[in-house]
Curated annotation (Swiss-Prot):
Protein's name in the database: Casparian strip membrane protein 5
Cysteine-cysteine disulfides: none
Species assigned in the record: Arabidopsis lyrata subsp. lyrata
Chief location category: membrane
Source domain of life: Eukaryota
Glycosylation sites: 140
Length: 187
């Protein structure tokens, strides 16, 4: 009879450790979602408010650089805004994972949606990165000149918004891995 009780005690301790680890993963997932939200919304706002005007010869002739002059940068803003909206809405499910233990279906749903948002965000960030590269370096073969020597503030802001977006890409990858780890621990 004693050996049966010892097995039950050992099993219940294992369940408690597993539950504690699942709760820690859920809390970390919640925090990462908040950090990723601030990165994506910050990137969208920074890029969306980027514009610089330079006078040319006289005050009546000016050159302007705005994010919406290039479709890739507009796509970047939209992608970051969509992902930040998703991250805010997913916080409710992430909170449920902290409170409840049996959350397999919602974890699978979040993994699928996280992968979709990762694809959208990485597409937006990659397309904007190509434009930022051209703005900094130009392309001699096609006679596209680097504009960052003239539009320094514009280039600093769009480069900064890219950094925040790529940090959010890494955070989404970590969220997917954490959800997969949490699912695998249940089986």
């Amino acid at each position: 009879m004693k050996s049966g009780q010892a097995e039950i005690v050992e099993t219940s301790k294992g369940i408690q450790k597993s539950g504690l680890m699942s709760r820690r993963i859920a809390i970390l997932e919640f925090i990462l979602r908040i950090v990723a939200f601030f990165n994506t919304i910050g990137s969208a706002i920074l890029m969306g408010t980027t514009h610089e005007t330079l006078p040319f010869f006289t005050q009546f002739i000016r050159f302007q650089a705005e994010y919406n002059d290039l479709p890739a940068l507009t796509f970047f803003v939209v992608a970051n805004a969509v992902v930040s909206g998703y991250l805010i809405m997913s916080l409710t499910l992430a909170f449920v994972h902290i409170v409840k233990r049996k959350t397999q279906n919602t974890r699978i749903l979040l993994i699928v949606l996280d992968v979709a948002m990762l694809g959208l965000l990485s597409a937006g960030a990659s397309s904007a990165a190509a434009i930022v590269y051209l703005a900094h370096n130009g392309n001699n073969k096609t006679n596209w000149f680097a504009i960052c020597q003239q539009f320094n503030s514009f280039c600093e802001r769009i480069s900064g918004s890219l950094i925040g977006s790529f940090i959010a890409v890494v955070l989404l990858i970590l969220l997917i891995l954490l959800s997969a780890i949490a699912l695998s621990r249940r089986h």
